[in-house]
């Protein structure tokens, strides 16, 4: 009681909602299905599987457009579903956590109650939704719309759900942020990666994975490490984003090879992984009894990362930054009886992003 049960949706603030919606539909298989238009803003709702994304743009200057100038297009809200909002609110009162906005909307489709919190140390908010028996298309005030016609007539790129989100923090602020999540949402620390793993000659980082009791909500927090001669990828994000924020979210898919092939055909670019990584992977796999149904040659060719244990494996791949600023990217992930988080790939991912930093000239 009094905890979150699932990611409901994420919301972007962008300069042009229609153009951004088209890009995410084109590259990542989303479809637009609902919209909310007011005198002040346009919001377009996208879906792929149960993953939901709202793309919002504003028509006049306000606090959100000021944040847009600061961050560029960015994820403003990571929303969660709760079963008992009253219990959550009581927990917030007990922990002296401020609710910045509450609403209760009753429509013919049912009752929706919300509470919005400002996260620790940044502009990201979390809206908590108690939906009960609500049977609407999406949320109150959103009306159904058709998808872009083009994407109704080309190959689909189906996702299952939104697997997790990752947020970056300035050096020294991650633990306070984690404590905020412990108190507000009753998340727990599941594992961590320190600067002995995510490290190079030039930079380092540390990260904590926070989960709810059922592991249906996974939030990773990351920060850079002091004392290195270069600038960590987390510090690069902080500089370009103008502070802490959501670095990426992950879409869970059933067939990552097919998904990546489709996305690459639509001009989505992914990080490249050295051949040595796959040589080592194949050697490690040869010493186990694990059966991998995917073609390892295709995994190598597509630059897909793999982590495994005695029970199963995980496949994951990371896009290059999706915007002019090297901030937001998207992860595609496939799980085969594997509940871990790709900890074995953290070093490979760290090195791949650092190589991109070096190309951009932002490592020093």
Curated annotation (Swiss-Prot):
Domain of life: Eukaryota
Name of the protein in its database record: Putative protein C31H2.4
Keyword annotations from UniProtKB, A to Z: Iron, Metal-binding, Repeat
GO cellular component terms, semicolon-separated: endoplasmic reticulum membrane; Golgi membrane
Pfam family, one: Glyoxalase
Family as reported in the entry's similarity comment: Belongs to the 4HPPD family.
One of the record's GO molecular function terms: 4-hydroxyphenylpyruvate dioxygenase activity
Gene Ontology biological-process entries: tyrosine catabolic process
Organism: Caenorhabditis elegans
Residue ranges constituting the VOC domain according to the UniProt record: 6-134, 161-320
NCBIfam families: 4HPPD
Cofactor: Fe cation
Signal peptide (residue range): none
Presence of the UniProt keyword Repeat in the record: yes
Residues annotated to bind Fe cation: 164, 248, 331
Cofactor-binding details, from the entry: Binds 1 Fe cation per subunit.
PROSITE patterns attached to this UniProt entry: VOC
């Amino acid at each position: 009681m009094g905890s979150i049960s699932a990611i409901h949706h994420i919301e972007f603030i962008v300069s042009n909602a229609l153009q951004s919606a088209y890009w995410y539909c084109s590259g990542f298989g989303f479809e637009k299905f609902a919209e909310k238009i007011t005198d002040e803003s346009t919001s377009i709702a996208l879906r792929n599987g149960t993953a939901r994304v709202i793309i919002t743009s504003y028509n006049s200057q306000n606090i959100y457009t000021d944040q847009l100038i600061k961050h560029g297009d960015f994820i403003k809200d990571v929303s969660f579903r709760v079963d008992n909002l009253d219990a959550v609110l009581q927990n917030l009162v007990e922990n002296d956590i401020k609710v910045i906005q509450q609403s209760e909307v009753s429509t013919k489709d049912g009752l929706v109650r919300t509470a919005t919190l400002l996260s620790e140390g940044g502009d990201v908010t979390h809206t908590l939704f108690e939906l009960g028996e609500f049977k609407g298309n999406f949320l109150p005030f959103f009306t159904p719309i058709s998808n872009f016609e083009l994407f109704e007539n080309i190959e689909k790129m189906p996702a299952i759900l939104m697997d997790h989100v990752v947020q970056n923090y300035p050096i020294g602020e991650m633990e306070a942020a984690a404590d905020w999540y412990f108190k507000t949402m009753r998340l727990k620390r599941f594992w961590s990666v320190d600067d002995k793993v995510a490290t190079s000659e030039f930079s380092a980082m540390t990260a904590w994975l926070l989960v709810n009791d059922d592991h249906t909500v996974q939030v990773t927090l990351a920060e850079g490490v002091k004392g290195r001669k270069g600038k960590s990828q987390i510090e690069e994000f902080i500089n370009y984003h103008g502070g802490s924020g959501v670095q990426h979210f992950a879409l869970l898919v059933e067939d990552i090879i097919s998904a990546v092939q489709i996305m690459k055909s639509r001009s989505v670019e992914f990080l490249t992984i050295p051949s040595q990584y796959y040589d080592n992977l194949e050697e490690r796999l040869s010493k186990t009894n694990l059966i991998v149904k995917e073609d390892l040659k295709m995994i190598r060719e597509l630059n897909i990362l793999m982590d495994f244990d005695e029970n199963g494996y995980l496949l994951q791949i990371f896009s290059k930054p999706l915007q002019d600023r090297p901030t937001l990217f998207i992860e595609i992930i496939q799980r085969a009886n594997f509940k871990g988080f790709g900890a074995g790939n953290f070093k490979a991912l760290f090195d791949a992003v650092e190589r991109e930093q070096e190309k951009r000239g932002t490592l020093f």
